């Protein structure tokens, strides 16, 4: 891997930050998901620049951006497309839906019925759509950012655990600081700077392939697995007091995504090998939405993040000598 390959990520962030103030965590996670071929579930109140963040990111890579506002009257055909009868020709023509884009914002995904949510999640997983007898692949790269409003829950359709598990990351977005909000108001009430394209979609796909080559030491895989299995059996890690708070822990998909996301984060940070800190930094965003908490946790006002922070503190951080990392990379690249 060329060490300079991390620099396009820096230029991309620079361009996005011309428009977006703050939200560094969300922006970094967007890039990680894009490089790791994952999708993001974002939870936050309206007005925190979620739409603008992904739209600006699309501009920086020369990709196509589309937004779907999820509502109770939405049907799957509104997402994936349908076949329309042409009276002039007497034939059916296929009209592709808005999921055929590079970056898709699924706004307030929990406001649409389960069959619509399932249609989107199927596209996310399969990266293709079948309409009639024809199958159409979505463009590459393809990233879905789905949002949920944590305040308004009346009239919503909560995502089932099996579907939430399909998202690589769940990111919590909070309010900006006073200083950041001042800059936001100042910037949004004047002419915005133009965002320059720093990559093509083809170059981004090439970078995804470079991320696949980032070396992950077996001890880091063991570290990730221990984190995830601790959510299923906290008593095995000296955390028996957490057992009654967790009904179901994270699935093996969490371990897989933790390695994929940690590898992409290492690439963003300019390395061709992952460190324990990369795995640790991604742990909350990868695991938090995969926990099913008990009623006791809800009654005691205990959140998934509270439990995860205790688990992460208990799992010992492995030491990976730099010499072993270099040897591993040489073997891998041989």
Where are these regions (language model features)?
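C-terminal engagement/docking regions of AAA+ P-loop ATPases
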Residues: 1, 236-334
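Conserved C-terminal "switch" segment of AAA+ ATPases
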Residues: 2-6, 19-20, 156, 170-241, ...
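Pre-Walker A (pre-P-loop) alpha-helix and adjacent loop at the N terminus of AAA/AAA+ ATPase modules
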Residues: 5-48
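Conserved alpha-helical scaffold flanking the Walker A/P-loop in AAA+ ATPase domains
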Residues: 29-32, 85-105
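Walker A/P-loop
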Residues: 34-71
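Conserved beta-strand position immediately N-terminal to the Walker
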Residues: 40, 104, 142
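Walker B catalytic acidic pair
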Residues: 44, 107-108, 119
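Canonical AAA+ ATPase core
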Residues: 86-91, 108, 112-116, 124-214, ...
């Amino acid at each position: 891997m060329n060490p300079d390959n991390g620099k396009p990520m820096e230029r991309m962030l620079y361009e996005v930050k011309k428009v977006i103030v703050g939200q560094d965590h969300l922006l970094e996670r967007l890039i990680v998901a894009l490089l790791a071929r994952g999708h993001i579930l974002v939870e936050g109140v309206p007005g925190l620049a979620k739409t603008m963040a992904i739209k600006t990111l699309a501009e920086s890579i020369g990709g196509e951006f589309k937004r779907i506002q999820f509502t109770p009257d939405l049907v799957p055909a509104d997402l994936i497309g349908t076949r329309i009868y042409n009276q002039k020709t007497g034939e059916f023509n296929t009209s592709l839906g808005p999921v055929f884009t590079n970056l898709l914002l699924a706004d307030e995904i929990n406001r649409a019925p389960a069959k619509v949510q399932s249609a989107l999640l199927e596209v996310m997983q399969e990266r293709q759509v079948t309409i009639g007898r024809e199958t159409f692949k979505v463009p590459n790269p393809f990233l879905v950012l789905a949002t949920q409003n944590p305040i308004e829950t009346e009239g919503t359709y909560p995502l089932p655990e099996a579907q939430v598990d399909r998202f690589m990351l769940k990111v919590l977005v909070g309010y900006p600081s006073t200083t950041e909000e001042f800059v936001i108001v100042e910037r949004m009430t004047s002419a915005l700077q133009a965002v320059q394209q720093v990559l093509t979609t083809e170059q981004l796909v090439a970078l995804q392939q470079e991320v696949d080559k980032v070396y992950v030491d077996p001890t880091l895989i063991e570290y990730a697995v221990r984190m995830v299995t601790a959510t299923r059996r906290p008593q095995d890690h000296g955390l028996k007091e957490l057992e009654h708070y967790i009904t179901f822990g994270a699935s093996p998909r969490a371990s897989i995504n933790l390695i994929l996301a940690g590898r992409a984060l290492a690439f963003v940070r300019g390395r061709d090998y992952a460190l324990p800190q990369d795995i640790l930094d991604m742990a909350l965003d990868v695991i938090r939405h995969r926990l099913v908490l008990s009623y006791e946790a809800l009654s005691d006002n205990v959140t998934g993040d509270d439990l995860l922070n205790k688990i992460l503190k208990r799992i010992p951080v492995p030491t990976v000598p730099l010499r072993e990392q270099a040897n591993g990379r040489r073997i891998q690249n041989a």
